[in-house]
Amino acid sequence: MEKESENASCAGLLGQKNEPGSPTQSRSGKHKLSVCSKICFAIGGAPYQITGCALGFFLQIFLLDIAQVPPFYASIILFSGRVWDAITDPLVGFFVSKSSWTRLGRLLPWVVFSTPFAVVSYLLIWFVPGFSGVSMVIWYLVFYCLFQTLVTCFHVPYSALTMFISKEQSDRDSATGYRMTVEVLGTVLGTAIQGQIVGRENTPCVEHIRETHLYNTSVIMEDLNITHDVESLSSTRDAYMIAAGVICAIYVLCAIILTLGVREKRDAYELLSDQPFSFWQGLKLVMSHKPYIKLITGFLFTSLAFMLLEGNFALFLTYTMGFRRDFQNILLVVMLSATLTVPFWQWFLTRFGKKTAVYFGISSVIPFLILVVLMESNLILAYVVAVAAGLSVAAAFLLPWSMLPDVIDDFILKNPDSHGHEPIFFSFYVFFTKFASGVSLGISTLSLDFAGYQTRACSQPEQVNLTLKMLICVAPVILILLGLLLFILYPINEEKRKQNKKALQLIRESNRDSDSDSLELASNV
């Protein structure tokens, strides 16, 4: 049945070639992707970023201070969840690449069927169950891993969809720019919804902690009414659930818009071959492509740097800087700055090239990270650093997704008989970044445990503040510099990219001529 469906889909696509206004009829590439289609495609990127930003900024502090999971076990949850998430990416990518074409396409059905289960599991991540101990750890670990699996079933096909919304590289680059703008806007929404709803609640802290027992924190709260403390903590937990519900509603809405507003286009050169390949064959081909390895290695280091920032910035602002009541607003400024500067970086990479944009964009945050750690606590300075960090975050968001299609085009030219590997390219990039995220969260939370982090304390020991400074400044700066050094080896510059574009255009035109001749011969017979 799958083969019959695939043949029918292929025949349908070939049958459309004589229709007026079809993409094949326009060999000069005049049929550009509409702005509406680009916007609908871009909106599909919001759910992953909204949920990812909320989890990245707030899950650690939620587990530590609201669910009151001890730091060691919180590190296990965060690390295991992200590593599991990383493992599922290449597996989902492989299964997506083996999917047969349907009326919706090959990729969009994954979006449709994963969405309802993803939103339920996301809600349960932010729910504090009525039990404690190992059962609570298992609860968060199961639903965190389940959500990461389901959101992967959404995001990997969506990422691969970049290659199938248009045959024109300029359209794909433009759509990527739209997508990055919406995705960074999604991080603003995630930060705003989670931060502002939760930030309205005054989560109580404990001035003096005498002793803490595993899963059953025993504290002496001086000058703090215990009844008020319990009620306030309960209202904070409710606020987290309300924020999760709002985010889930946006998730579903974005999935509907993506499904209804975007149509997959099966590329002309892909129709020439549908030879089956195993997971290991596809993986071997992809991982032997040197430009891809160099690209993802460079972004692995820079992504790890920004994930360390994301995972620890809220704790740094709350405890080291002392901005307990302002941290959600500072995070919001970071994301707003990133959103507003994505169009600038889109223009910059078009004008000066993508490698140049990498060097300028990602390195721009370094002096401000050093400044915020060396200077005394200053709210105005914190907002200045937030704006500068947003500028660099925008570049870090845009550039990988803008450069991956160039690597895939280069792969297609060097492996003309191998098709359908696009999901593996995207999924393995996401695999490495998520693995880096798991490592960063696990190491940072474990480091805080070793430094003596005190759950719900109003202030932390000096060792904890020093650890947060290392996680916010020293480690990210070193990782960014290593990543930028590796980008020197990346071979696809602007000249090479333009050569690949011309070569692919010639292949597509040749294939269209061949298809047209075959159809004409068949009609004559």
Swiss-Prot record:
CDD domains the record matches: MFS_NLS1_MFSD2A (cd17451)
Listed Pfam families: MFS_2
Cytoplasmic compartment segments: 1-32, 95-106, 163-169, 261-291, 349-352, 415-424, 488-525
SUPFAM superfamilies xref list: MFS general substrate transporter
Catalytic activity: a 1-acyl-sn-glycero-3-phosphocholine(in) + Na(+)(in) = a 1-acyl-sn-glycero-3-phosphocholine(out) + Na(+)(out); 1-(4Z,7Z,10Z,13Z,16Z,19Z-docosahexaenoyl)-sn-glycero-3-phosphocholine(in) + Na(+)(in) = 1-(4Z,7Z,10Z,13Z,16Z,19Z-docosahexaenoyl)-sn-glycero-3-phosphocholine(out) + Na(+)(out); 1-(9Z-octadecenoyl)-sn-glycero-3-phosphocholine(in) + Na(+)(in) = 1-(9Z-octadecenoyl)-sn-glycero-3-phosphocholine(out) + Na(+)(out); 1-hexadecanoyl-sn-glycero-3-phosphocholine(in) + Na(+)(in) = 1-hexadecanoyl-sn-glycero-3-phosphocholine(out) + Na(+)(out)
Residues glycosylated per entry: 216, 225
Entry's family note: Belongs to the major facilitator superfamily.
Protein name in the entry: Sodium-dependent lysophosphatidylcholine symporter 1
Organism: Xenopus tropicalis
